[in-house]
Structure formats: C-alpha cells, structure tokens
Amino acid sequence: MVKNYVSIDIGGTAIKYGVIAEDGRILTKDKMDTEAEKGGPEILNKVFGIVEYYLDKYKIEGICISTAGMVDTEKGEIFYASPLIPRYTGTKFKEELERKYSIPCEVENDVNCAGLAERISGAAIDSKVTLCLTVGTGIGGCILIDENVFHGFSNSACEIGYMKMFDSDFQTLGATSILSKKVAERKQSSKEIWDGYHIFEEAKKGDDICIAAIDEMVEVLGIAIANLCYVINPQVVVLGGGIMDQDEYLKPKIEKALQKYLLPSIAEKTRLEFAKHKNDAGMLGAFYNYKNKH
C-alpha cells in the first residue's frame, strides 16, 4: 500500500496543506487563512482539523509541519515567534499531534523547509553548500550542507532578517513591505495600492520612482548576500518569496550587485538561482524533512 503524509505549511497569512505520496507527488492540496491574530491555540486547532479531515480519506503514515517562527526540531515546538502571532511561542506541535493521533510528526522552520525543497528537487539540486533567502514581509534565510539544514547550536542559525545593516537591520531595509512603503510615501499615495506586483509593472513601463525604489532594495540585497557569501561560501544562492517571481527583471540587477560587492574569484563560483517550487515549497520541504528523519 502506498504511504501518504499530511503536510502543513503555516505562514503568517495562510496555512497551505495537502497530502503527499511517498514518492513526493502532491496528491491534493488546499489553503485557509491563518487568522494569526487569534493566536497559537487557534492555529493548533486548525491543524487538528486538517489532520482529522485527511485521516478520514487516506492512510496517513506521518505528519509534516513547516511553520513560521524559531523551531526546536528535536521537541517539535516553537521556542520563539513574532508578536504578529500571539501565544504561538511554546506551541508543542509534535507532542500534541503524536499524543492525539499516535502518528509520527516532525516540525521545521518554514524557510528551512523551502531551502530543503529547492535543494532536493528544485533550483539547487546537487549543490554542496546552499544559501536560501525568502524575501517577503520579512526576510528569512537557510543554510544547507548537501541535503542537511545547518541549525546552529540552538536552532537559530541564519535568522538573517535581524542582521545589522547601516543604522537598521536587513529586513527593515530590504523586505517587500519596505519597498511598498517607500513608493507610497514618494508618490504620496496609499501603501495598499502599491504592492510588489504593481510596483514592478510600473517600473517596466519606466516609472522613475518605482525603478529607484527597486534599485535601492537590490543594493541592500546585494550587500547582504555578498556578506553572507564571504562567510558561507555557497555554491548556489536561491532567492524565493513572492517578489522573486519577478526573476527576469531582478536577476540581472542582483547579479550586477553581487559582482560589485564580491571578489571576482568568489563571484564566478557562486550561482544565483530563483526558487522553483513557489507556493508548494513549504509543504514539500516539510515532507523531505520528515523523510530525512524516518
């Protein structure tokens, strides 16, 4: 009988979930609003509901969780979460799910899961050392040695959004939310109007304000990625997050920035790629993380 796995990707805005077969095929998938403001206990209840729904329809061998926040991967619990998800810190996914359903469960940080997905079946196949960045409302990072996530001493390696840059930090200067804020302020308009997609569409038409704001973001990304490359020496750098769907526009600009800030001998040995798995990365990565442990 084919073994199936429930895979759940918990983000600040949406929970993506589905069933994945043992060979990595996604058999079914869906999503729901996280309703993060309701807090950790309500998210746990949503996860219970998802698992119970699929237990009625499939023979489930394991539960795979990808989640925002810092994760103790041994205990399978959140040891730090942003205030945007109240009462999420301390959520014991592994303990609660294994106790309730007697099915093995593994939990991993969402950016680490995205990195695993890209390394195993996406943009960084066969990479010896991989650096993965996701750029969205904030900025997250992941380091992989072959197919293994580097967690650091206490499971907080590569929290790159908090890196200090100039008089601020990386995600305060380089995230998509800052791009929208800059354009809206310079145009004396509403931030809601200027989402990433709209900004890039106008930049392609020659809008000077949008072009300048994107170039400023690329400069920040270039400096940060170059500094990370000096420390980690990755073979492949993978960029993900919604804004990175604009790869045709961004890739030459980011490559130029890396050439500016990296020594030529390092730049020529560092490959820049854009994430392939898009919205499925978290679910796939959670599945790969589970399979690595079982």
Where do the language-model regions lie?
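Short glycine-rich anion-binding loops that position phosphate/pyrophosphate groups of nucleotides
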Residues: 68-71, 136-138, 243
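Short hydrophobic alpha-helix segments
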Residues: 30-32, 82, 153
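Short loop/edge segments at beta-strand edges and connector loops
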Residues: 107-111
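Glycine-rich phosphate-binding loop of actin/hexokinase-like ATP-binding domains
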Residues: 125-177
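A charged helix-plus-loop insertion that forms the helical arch/lid used to bind
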Residues: 77-90
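A cytosolic small-molecule/anion-sensing beta-strand core signal
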Residues: 21-22, 67, 145-146
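A short acidic/small-residue loop/turn micro-motif
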Residues: 34-35, 86, 157-159
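ATP-binding/phosphotransfer module of carbohydrate and carboxylate kinases, centering on a glycine-rich
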Residues: 1-62, 72-77, 99-105, 117-127, ...
